[in-house]
Amino acid sequence: MPSLLSSRIRNAEFAKKIVTDPAKLVPYFKNGDYVGWSGFTGVGYPKMIPNALARHVEENNLQGKLRFKLFVGASGGADTECKWAELNMIERRCPHQVGKPISKGINSGRIQFFDKHLSMFPQDLLYGYYTRNRESNTIDTAIIEATAITEDGGIVPGASVGASPELMQLAEKIIIEVNTAIPSFEGLHDIVEIPNPPHRTPININRVDDRIGKPYIKVDPKKVIGIVEADYGDITCANSPQDETSQAIAGHLVDFFHHEVSVGRLPKNLHPLQSGIGNIANAIIGGLAHSPFKDLEVWTEVLQDTFLPLFDSEKLRFATATSTRFSPQGFEKFYSNYDYYKERILLRPQVISNHPEIIRRLGCIAMNTPVEADIYAHANSTNVLGSRMLNGLGGSADFLRNAKLSIMHTPSVRPSKKDPTGITCIVPMATHVDQTEHDLDILVTEQGLADLRGLSPTERAREVIDKCAHPDYKPLLREYFDIAENYCLARGAGHEPHILANAFKMQLNLLEKGTMKIDHW
């Protein structure tokens, strides 16, 4: 056994289960198997076994003949999951995914996909909701990345935890990939398993840095059929660069935080922050690094590169997540100063990081990006034009429904092929609703910030149009609302005015003419 691998596997019983050739484990997989992977937002995912299975399919022309029902906490690795999608190896997938081949498979009907709130996915697994057509509530195999195995057989995850504890609990067979290409993450995790009702008790987390579990995942050694060494790290890409739009949105939010502090609705160090993924999220965290706010705390799903400078500035005191999804440069920075960051970061299972009880208790400030939002503050996070799936709901609704402050941020327009302005992200009616009008407090674009707290639907519509819509679309949206309000009031139905015949006219015009700038209502 290589010395580096032996130093990571400190349990003699597990050391006997090392398999030097991943291909030797391929026969354990059968068509139609229920398979679970570790991983969340493209880090901490298994590499060697998925690649061995892909090679087996490719070399033996088994495309479409060896397919799996694949369960991952969120997205797996692009180098593995996309390859499986290209080879038609995924029959069913949930609850969240990233990658053009996967999206193509879903929208062509080849992959049966369903998204789910990320806090609920692991518990629904344990309830047996996704295995109800099987004789037992189990999955066939879980493939889990680890960075170490402790003396008493505990599995130390890597850059993410996700749903690994629940997948291991349900698996009939477990394969562990010990990744020696990255440092051991031992001590960075707080693992707790929540029992099913009626045996639940309150989750005793009152601060972002509270520890209530163990630094490893417990595993039944009898389930482990093999341990392989992974020889390369997580393959990630550079983060989306900030631009004028994202910086303007960040500026509006920082100004808003200043105002909330000045009137006493927020403390000077705000409340624990949750931030999604993308250039807007990066700009907001970057903006906080240059603000006077300090002693900040984070309770979120995913940590990105921009959190590292916030730590370095000593403005960020502590951060909890279920994943550290850094770029290659970000991981290099993280590893080079690992001892410093290790004392300030804690990774938890997604059932804890996204748990409504904790989010509400801590009073989190949730910030996420939708595909579109309508004038009444319903938001679509998943389906373009109501039907084309992007990635899935993720954890945005876990946070937005339960946060003290629920914020959605989006550009007012997105680029399009035919219209120089682009398509409007503020529409009369959202073509799909993931977050309802009851979930959002603040909507912000580069044009401005709409504070929707305590407003009626008609008041919200005026606020959203005036503050958030792009100037090229503002007159059209105002005209729609005015016509709808007059029409609905005249028939005694004016609470949330809509004209159903026209509500999707801008989207239909986009499909027919390539622009959302209609000639008339």
UniProtKB/Swiss-Prot annotation:
Q: Which domain of life is it from?
A: Eukaryota
Query: Looking at the UniProt record for this protein, which Gene Ontology cellular component terms does it annotate, in alphabetical order?
Result: cytosol; mitochondrion
Q: What are the record keywords, sorted? A: Cytoplasm, Hydrolase
Q: Which reaction does it catalyse?
A: acetyl-CoA + H2O = acetate + CoA + H(+)
Q: Name one GO molecular function term.
A: succinyl-CoA:3-oxo-acid CoA-transferase activity
Residues bound to CoA:
G276, I277, G278, N279, I280, N391, G395
Q: Please name the InterPro entries in this protein's record.
A: AcetylCoA_hyd_C (IPR026888), AcetylCoA_hyd_C_sf (IPR038460), ActCoA_hydro (IPR046433), ActCoA_hydro_N (IPR003702), NagB/RpiA_transferase-like (IPR037171)
The UniProt entry, under SUPFAM superfamilies, shows: NagB/RpiA/CoA transferase-like
What broad class describes the main subcellular location of this protein? cytoplasm
Which protein are we looking at?
A: Acetyl-CoA hydrolase
